[in-house]
Amino acid sequence: MMNASRTLISTCLLAFVLAGGCASFQVGRDVQAGRAALQTGHPEDAIIYLGRAAESDPNYKLPTRAQESILTYLGRAYYETGDNTKARAVLERALANDNNDYLARLYFGLTLYRSNDRERGRKEIDAGLNGMHAWLDEVTSDSVYGIYWDPNRTIRLAIERTLAGKPEAGEFTASAQRIGRQFDSEIDRARQSEIQSTYQPGGKN
């Protein structure tokens, strides 16, 4: 009887672990699908994937050096569909969870700027861009994996030009959005470069 009880308990625990693992796997798949939709200009589709994933695990972060939040991407998706109210609410949650989420701060600033709160919006955009620049400086200083990030300083130079210039409102926000997209793409490019370097003949493995 005792053995039967132990077997039942073990089976239940295994089922619980597997269910949790399956749920985490699905969240990861939805986040990647949502990011892909954003990167290909389909924010409405991104909201479907990212919204579902955020309901399951609102604290999920990308398993990369940048560790971007699912809420950051969902907020960006709402921003790109023109829904400032939802974008602001979600991005505020992202920043409440991580005040150093510079991509979230960038899109939060863009949302405020487009909502006619331009003074505060500009400050938040500047803070987001400066934070991204500092983060890239820090990560590229690492002797092991720093070489894979922004190797030609393309993103950092774009940030410097945007912050140093005095572009018209439309040009400024367009430049800031472009940098946000570049940073997101850099996450994938850097990871792919690191993987290729690790597993090629003579690599780190």
Label each residue range with its predicted role:
Residues W135-N205:
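Terminal, low-structured helical/coil segments at or just beyond the last alpha-helical repeat
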Residues A54, Y102, L110-D137, L163-P167:
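TPR/TPR-like (Sel1-like) alpha-helical repeat modules
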